[in-house]
UniProtKB/Swiss-Prot annotation:
It comes from Bacillus cereus (strain Q1). The keyword Coiled coil applies. Keywords: Coiled coil, Ligase. The lineage of its organism: Bacteria, Bacillati, Bacillota, Bacilli, Bacillales. InterPro entries: Bacillithiol_biosynth_BshC, CC_BshC, Rossmann-like_BshC. It is an enzyme of class 6 (ligase). This is Putative cysteine ligase BshC. Its EC number is 6.-.-.-. Belongs to the BshC family. Residues 460-485 form a coiled coil.
């Protein structure tokens, strides 16, 4: 594996944050400097965490996932007042979801290791599985290449019900068939059987989406020391009750903090991305197997436009009786994370970084400071055949990242032709139509009754010219079919569906191609935190 860094243009909050723009950095409580991390450690030392209860839960949960010894030791280390976490989170995508989930975890592991060495304190890696998510459409699919097209392959569970990812039971038989269909689209390699066994072993131990995700991730990172947490685990929810109560008692201040911070963001020229009603309480409650967002209505806490209604006392009572019914929204999830874990740093993708910039005053309302927010490592893998295609087309490795691949294809094709086709046909059409317009005037003068037919005649001639143009272009493309297929392969591999590779393709393809130790070998590479994109040649 060879690693190379390239600069890929970013936009908005992420670009300005990485470029060190003071205005947007003022929306975060810590800059990404070593001094800021030292200050963060000092700030965390002044806070209290329910470490023993948390460790007891994490030991039980990670042991059930058959965690390695390094993970167990890291969990136990959290009992120590001078142990901190680097944390990130993601939904429980089937087969772990898009590659960026793996890249987030690699980011967490690397930053935890680096900060432990540089700060001289114990830092452990934590990955937060968003088990409360009810949006199965976000996690129930993967993308494959089939018949030279990119296809979205959806897992259709035979027993679908509106439940969270932590509670949605998987039909193992259906899931096995779905996995088989996916692997049929991959080339069979020396690793295929091992990878399928690896996946099936995790599936066989799982009842829910979160179980399957947790077992797969734990097996993939078995020796890394990674700690997993299911954000919707009933035992964790019990530990969170005091903070849920605090949010309910301060929901107006939370909403005001969000509104004020979004005004700051607007003044800086950015568009806020968090959308909430002014009466939002920022907590979901599970009612009749549905996740209902609570809102304030004249002192009552209501859901679904008043279909459900609770007094403050009733809500608090329900939190104490059934904490597993409650979960956070996009605004309060980061706050709950801050309450539960002694967070040295949070690692997020571009979207997360943008919405965290809207939360500073929300954190302050609760009496917290935002942890350092570190953009995750971004990676693209280039296989040998794709590197060969790039070389054959005389393209740089950075070209598909800096330019639209379709545009690169068009430019290449136009360079193979002496005269530009589009311009020549535009000229020809103009000349022919000019002559025909003159002819139409002549016909109209002699026989006005033929005016309509003359107009149709012009349309037919135009159609024939366009047909000729299409046939010429088709023949040229056929002549250069080999090269144009290289562009298609590059597009599919590096910019599938016009998106970054890590947002579309799944890690299982790479495990199948390169073996079960693929992720371990990627983790051995040195990644930088300078905002550049990492290209790994395989």
């Amino acid at each position: 594996m060879e690693i190379k860094e390239i600069s890929v243009p970013q936009q908005g909050v992420v670009a300005d944050y990485m470029n060190g723009e003071k205005e947007i950095q003022s929306c975060f409580d810590y800059m990404l400097t070593e001094d800021a991390f030292k200050q963060r450690v000092q700030d965390l030392r002044e806070r209290e965490f329910f470490r023993q209860d948390l460790v007891a839960h994490l030991l039980e949960y990670n042991t059930k996932l058959q965690a390695g010894e390094a993970t167990i030791q890291n969990v136990k280390a959290l009992e120590d007042e001078d142990t901190y976490v680097v944390i990130a989170g993601q939904q429980a995508g089937l087969l772990t979801g898009p590659l960026y989930t793996i890249h987030k975890i690699i980011s967490v592991l690397q930053l935890a290791k680096e900060k432990e060495e540089s700060l001289g304190v114990k830092v452990v890696p934590v990955f937060w599985i968003a088990g409360e998510d009810h949006d199965m459409d976000e996690i129930n699919h993967t993308f494959v290449t089939k018949n030279k097209k990119i296809k979205k392959t959806i897992f259709h569970d035979r027993n679908p019900k509106k439940a969270s990812a932590s509670e949605s039971e998987l039909s193992l038989e259906d899931c096995r068939k779905w996995i088989e269909e996916i692997f049929k689209t991959y080339p069979e390699t020396n690793f295929t059987k091992d990878v399928l066994r690896f996946i099936d072993d995790s599936l066989g131990k799982s009842n829910t989406y979160v179980d399957f995700f947790g077992h797969l991730i734990m097996k993939m990172f078995i020796n890394s020391g990674l700690i997993l947490v299911d954000s919707h685990h009933p035992e964790l929810r019990k530990l969170e009750v005091p903070f849920f109560k605090q949010i309910v008692s301060k929901y107006k201040e939370v909403q005001e903090g969000l509104h004020n911070q979004q005004e700051v963001i607007k003044e800086l020229g950015y568009k806020p991305i968090i959308e909430t009603k002014s009466n939002a309480v920022h907590i979901f409650m599970e009612i009749d197997n549905e996740r209902v967002l609570l809102e304030d209505n004249q002192g009552k806490f209501v859901g679904k436009d008043g279909t459900y209604s609770f007094s403050y006392e009733e809500l608090i009572e329900e939190m104490e009786r059934s904490p597993e019914r409650f979960s956070n929204n996009v605004v309060t999830r980061p706050l709950m994370q801050e309450y539960v874990f002694p967070t040295l740093a949070f690692i997020g993708g571009p979207g997360e970084l943008a919405y965290w910039s809207e939360l500073q005053q929300v954190f302050h309302t609760i009496g917290f400071r935002m942890p350092p927010v570190v953009p995750r490592i971004t990676i693209t893998y280039i296989e040998r055949d794709i590197a060969t295609d790039l070389h054959d087309l005389q393209l740089q490795e950075s070209d598909p990242f800096l330019n639209n691949v379709d545009k690169l294809r068009e430019n290449w094709l136009s360079n193979q032709i002496e005269e530009p086709i589009d311009e020549r046909f535009v000229e020809a059409k103009k000349e022919i139509i000019d002559i025909h317009k003159s002819l139409q005037q002549f016909v109209k003068k002699i026989d006005p009754g033929l005016s309509s037919f003359a107009g149709k005649n012009e349309f037919k001639i135009n159609e024939q010219i366009e047909l000729l143009e299409r046939m010429l272009k088709r023949n040229i493309e056929k002549k250069h079919e080999v090269e144009l297929n290289k562009f298609r392969r590059i597009q599919f591999a590096i910019r599938p569906l016009g998106a970054p590779q890590e947002r579309v393709w799944n890690v299982c393809y790479y495990l199948n191609q390169f073996g079960l130790d693929f992720v371990d070998r990627v983790m051995e590479k040195p990644f930088s935190w300078n905002g550049k994109h990492h290209v790994i040649k395989l």
